[in-house]
Amino acid sequence: NLWQFEMLIMKIALTSGFMFYSSYGCYCGWGGHGRPKDASDRCCFVHDCCYGKVTTCNPKFGVVVCGGDDPCKKQICECDRVAATCFRDNKYWFYGAKXCQEESDPC
Protein backbone atom coordinates (compact mmCIF):
# COMPACT_ATOMS: atom_id res chain seq x y z
CA ASN A 1 0.00 0.00 0.00
CA LEU A 2 1.03 3.63 -0.21
CA TRP A 3 2.20 3.81 3.41
CA GLN A 4 4.41 0.75 2.90
CA PHE A 5 5.79 2.35 -0.26
CA GLU A 6 6.65 5.47 1.75
CA MET A 7 8.47 3.37 4.35
CA LEU A 8 10.42 1.57 1.61
CA ILE A 9 11.44 4.89 0.01
CA MET A 10 12.62 6.15 3.40
CA LYS A 11 14.63 2.95 3.96
CA ILE A 12 16.26 2.78 0.51
CA ALA A 13 16.42 6.40 -0.69
CA LEU A 14 16.69 7.96 2.80
CA THR A 15 14.05 10.56 1.94
CA SER A 16 10.30 11.00 2.20
CA GLY A 17 8.35 10.05 -0.89
CA PHE A 18 5.27 11.93 0.33
CA MET A 19 7.22 15.11 1.03
CA PHE A 20 9.40 15.17 -2.07
CA TYR A 21 7.61 13.20 -4.77
CA SER A 22 3.85 13.56 -4.16
CA SER A 23 3.53 16.40 -6.70
CA TYR A 24 6.77 16.15 -8.64
CA GLY A 25 6.96 16.39 -12.42
CA CYS A 26 4.34 14.79 -14.64
CA TYR A 27 4.11 11.35 -13.00
CA CYS A 28 4.89 11.52 -9.28
CA GLY A 29 1.63 11.74 -7.35
CA TRP A 30 -1.88 10.87 -8.54
CA GLY A 31 -2.35 10.30 -12.23
CA GLY A 32 0.22 11.15 -14.83
CA HIS A 33 0.41 12.54 -18.34
CA GLY A 34 2.97 13.92 -20.73
CA ARG A 35 6.69 13.20 -20.84
CA PRO A 36 8.68 12.68 -17.64
CA LYS A 37 10.59 15.86 -16.73
CA ASP A 38 13.78 14.16 -15.55
CA ALA A 39 15.17 10.85 -14.29
CA SER A 40 13.31 11.10 -10.96
CA ASP A 41 10.01 11.74 -12.74
CA ARG A 42 10.80 8.76 -14.98
CA CYS A 43 11.09 6.64 -11.80
CA CYS A 44 7.43 7.51 -11.15
CA PHE A 45 6.47 6.87 -14.78
CA VAL A 46 8.04 3.40 -14.66
CA HIS A 47 6.36 2.76 -11.28
CA ASP A 48 2.96 3.76 -12.72
CA CYS A 49 3.53 1.42 -15.68
CA CYS A 50 4.57 -1.38 -13.33
CA TYR A 51 1.42 -0.93 -11.22
CA GLY A 52 -0.60 -0.89 -14.45
CA LYS A 53 0.61 -4.41 -15.21
CA VAL A 54 -0.61 -5.67 -11.81
CA THR A 55 -4.17 -6.71 -12.57
CA THR A 56 -5.12 -9.34 -9.99
CA CYS A 57 -4.89 -7.13 -6.89
CA ASN A 58 -4.96 -3.44 -6.00
CA PRO A 59 -1.41 -2.19 -5.41
CA LYS A 60 -2.44 1.06 -3.68
CA PHE A 61 -4.56 -0.33 -0.86
CA GLY A 62 -4.38 -3.26 1.53
CA VAL A 63 -1.37 -4.69 3.30
CA VAL A 64 1.29 -6.30 1.12
CA VAL A 65 3.57 -8.94 2.61
CA CYS A 66 6.58 -9.03 0.31
CA GLY A 67 7.90 -12.40 1.40
CA GLY A 68 4.64 -14.25 0.80
CA ASP A 69 3.63 -16.63 -1.96
CA ASP A 70 1.11 -14.32 -3.66
CA PRO A 71 2.54 -13.53 -7.14
CA CYS A 72 0.53 -10.32 -7.39
CA LYS A 73 1.90 -8.99 -4.11
CA LYS A 74 5.43 -10.02 -5.12
CA GLN A 75 5.04 -7.91 -8.28
CA ILE A 76 3.83 -4.93 -6.23
CA CYS A 77 6.87 -5.29 -3.96
CA GLU A 78 9.17 -5.38 -6.97
CA CYS A 79 7.51 -2.27 -8.48
CA ASP A 80 8.01 -0.41 -5.20
CA ARG A 81 11.59 -1.63 -4.68
CA VAL A 82 12.64 -0.59 -8.19
CA ALA A 83 11.09 2.87 -7.75
CA ALA A 84 12.68 3.45 -4.33
CA THR A 85 16.08 2.42 -5.71
CA CYS A 86 15.54 4.70 -8.71
CA PHE A 87 14.81 7.67 -6.39
CA ARG A 88 18.00 6.90 -4.48
CA ASP A 89 20.07 6.75 -7.66
CA ASN A 90 18.77 9.92 -9.35
CA LYS A 91 19.14 13.57 -8.47
CA TYR A 92 16.12 15.39 -7.08
CA TRP A 93 15.23 18.66 -8.79
CA PHE A 94 11.92 20.23 -7.95
CA TYR A 95 9.84 20.10 -11.09
CA GLY A 96 6.27 21.04 -10.36
CA ALA A 97 3.40 19.25 -12.07
CA LYS A 98 3.03 21.69 -14.95
CA UNK A 99 3.71 21.67 -18.69
CA CYS A 100 2.66 18.04 -18.92
CA GLN A 101 0.43 18.37 -21.95
CA GLU A 102 2.60 16.39 -24.35
CA GLU A 103 1.58 12.98 -25.62
CA SER A 104 2.33 10.38 -22.95
CA ASP A 105 5.12 7.91 -23.56
CA PRO A 106 3.94 4.30 -23.91
CA CYS A 107 4.74 1.90 -21.09
Swiss-Prot record:
- What does the free-text pH dependence field read? Optimum pH is 5.5-8.5.
Main localization of the protein?
secreted
GO annotation (BP), single: arachidonate secretion
**What is the disulfide pattern of this chain?**
26-100, 28-44, 43-86, 49-107, 50-79, 57-72, 66-77
Q: Name one GO molecular function term.
A: calcium-dependent phospholipase A2 activity
Identify the GO cellular component terms for this protein.
extracellular region
**In which compartments does the protein localize?**
Secreted
Cofactor(s) recorded for this entry are: Ca(2+)
The family note in this entry says:
Belongs to the phospholipase A2 family. Group II subfamily. D49 sub-subfamily.
Briefly state the protein's biological role. Snake venom phospholipase A2 (PLA2) that induces significant edematogenic activity. Shows mild cytotoxicity on Trypanosoma cruzi and Leishmania infantum. Also inhibits ADP- and collagen-induced platelet aggregation. Does not show myotoxic activity.
The identity of this protein, by name, is: Acidic phospholipase A2 braziliase-I
